[in-house]
A protein has these predicted regions:
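Conserved binding/catalytic microenvironments
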Residues: 2, 6-300
Length: 300
């Protein structure tokens, strides 16, 4: 059971990185069928086969992440709750922390920034966190603080996240810390600053993150860049970005990304000061997006 669960984790992570969360959904459904413990209908007894329960906890964490990025928030809540239950049973504090960090992001996406802050606070323990993990906590807190309107606090937190990131990796970091890299941090720095309307600083950071090579889920930074350009009134840059995004929009496998793109494009179409050429480009982008995202952005 443990090797099988571990192989499933590897397969799901690879699918998500290469093709996105929506492409990974069929494999998620198979995993839920193959491992009934993930559904919550059965609970492994405490203290029994700790390695097996830890593998199931990690699998449930990955499932929760994919469901979130695929836009299935209710199911993501369930998977995260299940992962947390399993980590309690096996004592896997690192998978528990990663699940809490994922859930904090989900809560911010659902306009629950106070809940996000409470969840992020649960990541701490009796010992100081490794730098990369602490950086992630600070990133989650910065996003939530920005949504709450705490401009000074959000800036302080995202600056502190950069400082902690620069402290580097250590032997105390969990195995999943590899994906917290420079481009991930750049994207979140830009995104937090865009939430605050600090376009002069946000746009270059988002552009660097959006144009860097990386896994599929980082298309989100390109979507956030378009949303920021639209809000900043940077029409020429928005037109250039749409020209780059539209040919590959149909293949984006993240519902978060396609919804953000659809929202930005829809706003550009309705804008009273938006040039006609940009409105046409925004309409074209909507046509290129997967149908559910395009439909959700169109006025009723």
């Amino acid at each position: 059971m443990t090797p099988s669960a571990a192989r499933t984790v590897e397969r799901l992570v690879a699918l998500d990185a290469a093709r996105g969360a929506t492409a990974a959904l069929p494999a998620v459904r198979r995993a839920l069928r193959d491992f009934p413990e993930l559904s919550g209908d059965t609970t492994p007894p405490r203290g029994r086969d700790v390695d097996r329960v830890a593998a199931l906890a990690e699998l449930s964490e990955v499932v929760g992440w994919i469901l979130f990025d695929a836009g299935l928030h209710r199911q993501a809540h369930r998977a995260n709750a299940r992962a947390l239950t399993l980590t309690e049973l096996c004592g896997d504090r690192w998978t528990q922390r990663l699940t809490l960090l994922n859930h904090s992001m989900l809560q911010t996406a659902e306009a629950d920034p106070r809940g996000s802050l409470e969840t992020a606070a649960r990541v701490a323990g009796p010992r100081p966190l490794p730098a990369r993990v602490d950086s992630l906590v600070l990133i989650r807190q910065a996003h939530a603080s920005a949504v709450l309107g705490g401009r000074r606090e959000a800036r302080r937190l995202i600056s502190r996240a950069r400082s902690r990131f620069l402290d580097g990796l250590s032997r105390h970091d969990p195995h999943w810390a590899w994906w917290i890299d420079e481009n991930e941090l750049l994207g979140h720095e830009g995104w937090v600053l865009a939430r605050l309307g600090d376009w002069d600083r946000a746009l270059p950071l988002l552009h660097r993150a959006a144009t860097a090579p990386g896994p599929s889920y980082r298309h989100l930074f390109g979507a956030e860049l378009l949303a920021a350009l639209a809000r900043a009134g940077a029409w020429t840059e928005a037109l250039d970005l749409i020209a780059d995004l539209a040919p590959r929009a149909a293949a984006i496998g993240s519902a978060r990304t396609t919804r953000t793109l659809a929202g930005a494009a829809s706003g550009l179409r309705r804008g009273t000061r938006v040039p006609a050429s940009l409105k046409d480009a925004a309409a074209h982008l909507l046509e290129c997006l997967p149908a559910p995202a395009a439909r959700s952005a169109r006025p009723a």
